[in-house]
């Protein structure tokens, strides 16, 4: 019998002070300006069914194929190039290698375990939200360091937030693909990574700059990406 993972609670200022987003910090203010979409994203049907091990295989396959196509969009290379300090470049480069060693490997094992052929992979059409999300990420490719660091911070932070639901509930998924996806987005390594990104947002970004709109848009598109995982009537 599946253990049910409860919904996350309503967002509040200082929720992520333990990651460096103290109440009133730039990162916390961005978070608090987008609580509705954030709450809906991390408690979405897709996330809840994945955490409860009730997600239909067809939905998981379609979602992960589209997510994998995002993987090689060059975001990390641009971040490393624009990073203002060598230590930041080194941190980002190390995480980029971690993605290659762990996330890419997860995708490859998933495609093999679920017998996803190259033909099926290529034929999987992006959802409307996926198309919009991809176009938006492409539009950020020539933007400033504050906008780009906000982009990746928001994406990774939101994923940690939904994965944290199952840790808080002390529930371990029994479907390997579900557990593997959670494990990629929770744990000491991923928490440190998100904390490092939050620290950079606090240092280089402003709630009055264009990066605040980047945060808002990413949260909105992440919610729609989850919702669009299901056939739309």
Each language-model region and where it sits:
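Acidic, low-complexity proline/glycine-rich segments
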Residues: 2-47, 187-196
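Active-site-proximal alpha-helical scaffolds that flank and shape metal-associated catalytic sites
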Residues: 10, 18, 28, 65, ...
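Alpha-helical bundle segments that constitute or directly flank the non-heme di-iron/ferroxidase center
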Residues: 35-40, 54-82, 149-160, 226
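Extended amphipathic alpha-helical scaffold segments
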Residues: 41-42, 72-77, 105, 194-201
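Helix-loop segments that flank and shape redox-cofactor active sites
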Residues: 45-58, 72-93, 141
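Short, charged/polar, low-complexity loop and linker segments
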Residues: 47-52, 137-138, 201-206
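Long amphipathic all-alpha helical oligomerization modules
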Residues: 188-216
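A cross-kingdom marker for long, charged
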Residues: 215-233
């Amino acid at each position: 019998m599946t253990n049910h993972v409860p919904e996350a609670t309503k967002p509040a200022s200082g929720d992520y002070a333990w990651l460096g987003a103290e109440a009133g910090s730039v990162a916390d203010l961005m978070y608090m300006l987008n609580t509705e979409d954030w709450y809906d994203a991390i408690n979405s049907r897709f996330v809840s069914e994945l955490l409860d091990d009730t997600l239909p295989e067809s939905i998981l396959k379609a979602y992960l194929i589209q997510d994998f196509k995002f993987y090689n969009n060059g975001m990390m290379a641009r971040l490393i190039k624009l990073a203002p300090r060598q230590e930041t470049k080194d941190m980002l480069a190390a995480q980029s290698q971690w993605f290659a060693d762990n996330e890419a490997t997860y995708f490859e094992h998933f495609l093999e375990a679920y017998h996803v052929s190259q033909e099926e992979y290529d034929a999987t059409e992006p959802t409307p939200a996926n198309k919009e999300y991809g176009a938006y990420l492409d539009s950020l490719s020539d933007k400033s360091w504050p906008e780009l660091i906000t982009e990746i911070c928001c994406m990774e932070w939101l994923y940690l937030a939904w994965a944290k639901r199952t840790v808080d509930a002390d529930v371990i998924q029994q479907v390997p693909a579900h557990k593997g996806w959670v494990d990629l987005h929770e744990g000491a390594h991923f928490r440190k990574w998100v904390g490092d990104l939050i620290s950079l947002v606090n240092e280089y970004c402003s709630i009055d700059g264009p990066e605040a709109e980047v945060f808002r848009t990413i949260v909105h598109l992440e919610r729609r990406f989850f919702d669009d995982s299901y056939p739309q009537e």
